[in-house]
Amino acid sequence: FEMGDIEFNGKMYYGLMLNLNCYRGEVHVRVGTTKDCIVLKNSLVGDFNIGKRRYVSLNGEREIKGLDAGYYQVLYDGKDMILKQIRVELYDRAEFPSGNITKVFVPKVKYWLVKEGQVRQIRKERDLQRVYKPFKRDIKSYMSHHSEKDMDSNLVYLMSMVEGAH
């Protein structure tokens, strides 16, 4: 749980302890200083912040065509928007020779570009070259000097470059 703010049922609440359960797609609010928590109804949750991370709720009327309903982290919000979708899947893993089966949570991350109402999946930073053709050389130059392991900050930098902030 981290400190955050949330819009719930059209009203803002500040300074709450929040947690996003990516496996179940739920937002949890801790009750005071106890270990108890409340699971919020998805259809009533609006945008929220957990720590310094901002999230949008794309449930019900707020859905964007081409994206699954759920919560998305906003990495970049300018003329165009980059959203990060985090899902967690549960797998059984058998250990040999003991024969024990353990449950393993595996995070699955997808990045989405929302440009002029159209949604496109971004698998690598280089996918932006196809969308922003005038900046193809700049994107290629940037990526030749930066690791593709830090996708979040690379996408933020590239989008701010494309939209004229750098």
Task: Enumerate the predicted regions with their spans.
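Aromatic-patch recognition
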Residues: 2-122, 126
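Long, compositionally biased interface segments
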Residues: 130-166
